[in-house]
Amino acid sequence: MKSALCSRFFILLPWILIVIIMLDVDPRRPAPQLTSRPYFSPHAVGCGGSRVPLRRSSPGRDAAEKRNESRPQLQPEPRLPTIYAITPTYSRPVQKAELTRLANTFRQVAQLHWILVEDRATRSELVSSFLARAGLPNTHLHVPTPRRYKRPWLPRATEQRNAGLAWLRQRHQHQSAQPGVLFFADDDNTYSLELFQEMRTTRKVSVWPVGLVGGRRYERPLVKNGKVVGWYTGWREDRPFAIDMAGFAVSLQVILSNPKAVFKRRGSQPGMQESDFLKQITTVEELEPKASNCTKVLVWHTRTEKVNLANEPKYHLDTVNIEV
């Protein structure tokens, strides 16, 4: 009985397989196209002899590549004019605090070079160490003010500003000057970052208002039809340029084209150094008003309160010498 069932099963098995294959084949499915180009090249092998697939081309990809090849290359952005900030400084209890505040501002300005000039015969360790950690392109200069000029009623920082001007001229003496702008940044001033955007486009000499100066909330150039026509100031309106040292910037090319333009000690009256300097390089008609036609204050002539050190010990000092 078992042998009869097995014989019948093996007789029917081939026919069952044929029926299954016929049902699985879809007569509407297109036959695969044969190509003479293999997907794998027998000669393209990688490490260990493994086959490396060749990249297949397609009309869409070829068209995209042609579009990319024909697309013009983007030109590099023009280099920003360098802003040179000349800062006179002198030793006092708040010196490092003032310089720290100023450095925190300058660090946020692109393409700025800080020229720091000390009023002393040698570089101080405090300022040298400070600049080494400041993270700013800088030049550290020093020149002492002669004793006879250290009077309360005489202008300050004349020698230091002139040292910064001399360094700029010497640096660009034997090379073509790159676009640049110079301004005088006292270490106790406060600056809005917007001011640096304004001054960077200076063509010759640009001007703007200054806050908290001259016994007023602000001083500014008076502008009409885009030209400076006068001065809003609390002291000597008859000055040719009744402006604070923090209220103007000069193109580097103008500085180099006028090598004799400096701040003068002799023949310059108190409070007239700005006017005497600007008279050597420009005229009022050529001034370029910034800060919305000189209607916005972007720099303040702030002054740090005099430090009270009455309780500082003279004999029983701290065992640790901390720099302040």
Curated annotation (Swiss-Prot):
Xref: InterPro entries: Glyco_trans_43, Nucleotide-diphossugar_trans
Source organism: Mus musculus (Mouse)
UniProt superkingdom: Eukaryota
Entry's Gene Ontology BP terms: carbohydrate biosynthetic process; protein glycosylation
Protein known as: Galactosylgalactosylxylosylprotein 3-beta-glucuronosyltransferase 2
Annotated site residue numbers, Interaction with galactose moiety of substrate glycoprotein: 219, 311
SUBUNIT field: Homodimer.
Residue intervals annotated with topology Cytoplasmic: 1-2
EC numbers, comma separated: 2.4.1.135
A Pfam entry, by short name: Glyco_transf_43
Tissue-specific expression: Expressed in brain, but not in liver and kidney.
Lumenal side: 24-324
Glycosylated position list: 68, 293
Gene symbol of the encoding locus: B3gat2
Pathway of action: Protein modification; protein glycosylation
Protein keywords: Glycoprotein, Golgi apparatus, Manganese, Membrane, Metal-binding, Signal-anchor, Transferase, Transmembrane, Transmembrane helix
UniProt-listed PANTHER family: GALACTOSYLGALACTOSYLXYLOSYLPROTEIN 3-BETA-GLUCURONOSYLTRANSFERASE 2, GALACTOSYLGALACTOSYLXYLOSYLPROTEIN 3-BETA-GLUCURONOSYLTRANSFERASE BETA-1,3-GLUCURONYLTRANSFERASE
Transmembrane segments annotated in the record for this chain: 3-23
Coiled coil location: none
Active site: 274 (proton donor/acceptor)
Disordered: region residues: 50-78
Record's subcellular location: Golgi apparatus membrane
Reactions catalysed, as given in the entry: 3-O-(beta-D-galactosyl-(1->3)-beta-D-galactosyl-(1->4)-beta-D-xylosyl)-L-seryl-[protein] + UDP-alpha-D-glucuronate = 3-O-(beta-D-GlcA-(1->3)-beta-D-Gal-(1->3)-beta-D-Gal-(1->4)-beta-D-Xyl)-L-seryl-[protein] + UDP + H(+)
Membrane topology: Single-pass type II membrane protein
GO terms, molecular function: galactosylgalactosylxylosylprotein 3-beta-glucuronosyltransferase activity; metal ion binding
Annotated region described as Interaction with galactose moiety of substrate glycoprotein, given as residue ranges: 235-244
